[in-house]
Each structure stands twice: as structure tokens, then as C-alpha cells.
Amino acid sequence: MLMRWLSRWLARYLSKTVLRRSVSTATYEAIRDTLQPRDVLLVEGDARISVAIRYLTQSTWSHAALYLGPEAGLPAGEDGDPHVLVEADLEEGIRSIPLSFYRHVHTRICRPVGLGTYDLQAMTEYVHSRM
């Protein structure tokens, strides 16, 4: 019981936002219009754990989310904004989120190359099976 409490406390602590600074190199609209299903959205996170990840990996990016798009059948948020990304969160686990969640964060798009239609479909089905 103590370990469960401690792990939840630590996850909440590490998920807290530190300094929110944005040096986004692309507009939200440009990212929204450019993303294609199965792209990976790299994110420069602003949580305490993101700072540690960036330091340890010597990378600008601390986080990644898979873009499945509005046709993927993910649930919409309470505000009606369609969930189009799937990511792993320290507190919530695997979750779907809207693109607007990263509206004011520095991001970059990575597009898979050399994957066939079967591979892309298998990846989408795998993600759905884990939700």
C-alpha cells in the first residue's frame, strides 16, 4: 500500500509543469494540415520528467505521440475536440488525446518511410487493441 501511494505521488510530482516556454517553429494549423495517419509527433515536453528525459538523452524531444487521425474511431473529448493522438502518460497510462493538447508546445513530425499498407494497418490495429 505504501509503494502504491509513493509511486502515485512520484508520478504526480514528475508530471507537474515546470517552466512553460514555447519556441514552436510551426503553427498549430500547419501541423494539423500536414499530419497524416501513423505519423509520429515529437514533443518538447514541459513537465519535470521531460527535463530529465531531454537531459539524459541529449535530445530536444522528451515525448512522442502517434497520430491516427479523426477516422481512427478514437473517442472525442468532452469539448467535442476529436482525439487523434495516442500517447503514454506517466499518470494515466496509454491514452488518446486531441491534437490541440499540444497546441502551444514545440513539436516536430516524423513520417514512417518504407512501411507497406499491411504494416501500417497492423500498427493501427495494435494500438487499438492496447487502448
Describe every region a protein language model picked out.
Residues 1-131:
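Cysteine-nucleophile amide-bond enzymes
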